[in-house]
Amino acid sequence: DVKPYTDESVAMGDFLSKKCHVIAATDLRTRQYNKFAGTISALGALPSYDEVHTVLKTLSRNKAAKYLDGDKFSIIGIFPIGAGYLFTNDRKMNTVEALAGKRIATLNYQKDAIHMVNYVNSTVVPSDITNFGGKFNNGSVDICYSPAFAFSAYELYHGLGENGGIIRYQLAQLTMQLLTNTDSFDAKTRQASRNIMFSMFDKALNIVKKHE
């Protein structure tokens, strides 16, 4: 059975309580359970979708299983959900220096993003994937970052208004990952799942590019 959630943290809580065998969540949420796979979305790590394809293809191979299968948790599938872009309420903001003093909706569990925001002297506004869009749209923050699909899904055009814009620079490559308790499936099944997920890469990326 598949159970949809609107709050990723609630879904993770149910998974950790073993109310389900597998959770599909953003790598930002799953990285604490598999740090190796979590590095895919590190800021600036992968500059284009070609590199994402290469990395995910490599991780889908049998030899990579030792990096994805942990004693307690395993990643049994990864697919792209798009590069993260900056959405700003001021399209004139086109330099790093211009970010100083700006309020940025920042996921409170993404340490590299918090570091980046502090580094450019912006203000961290703790957020999560359920409320960052609302904060941007109501003016509580000046900037948020997300894959392109958020423009429609979170109605970010409200926050952009007439003066805003989307900075055409891929900050990071975000993915959805399937996380399971290692003892829920044998090694053969876990690997088969990874192979199936990678076989859907092109289909997933086509959806991403349509939104972009």
Protein language model annotation of sequence segments:
Residues 27-36, 133-138, 143-168:
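A ligand-binding cleft/hinge motif common to bilobed small-molecule-binding domains
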Residues 109, 129-130, 147-150, 181-183:
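Histidine- and/or cysteine-centered catalytic micro-motif in compact active-site loops
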Residues 13, 26-119, 156-159, 170-212:
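Contiguous mixed-secondary-structure segments that line small-molecule binding/active-site clefts
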Residues 4, 8-17, 23-30:
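Internal catalytic or translocation cores that form aromatic/hydrophobic pockets or channels
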Residues 1-2, 87-100, 134-144:
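Short secondary-structure boundary segments
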Residues 15-25, 103, 122-123, 137-147:
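Alpha-to-beta junction loops
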Residues 2-13, 108-111, 123-138:
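Short helix-initiation/N-cap motifs at beta->coil->alpha
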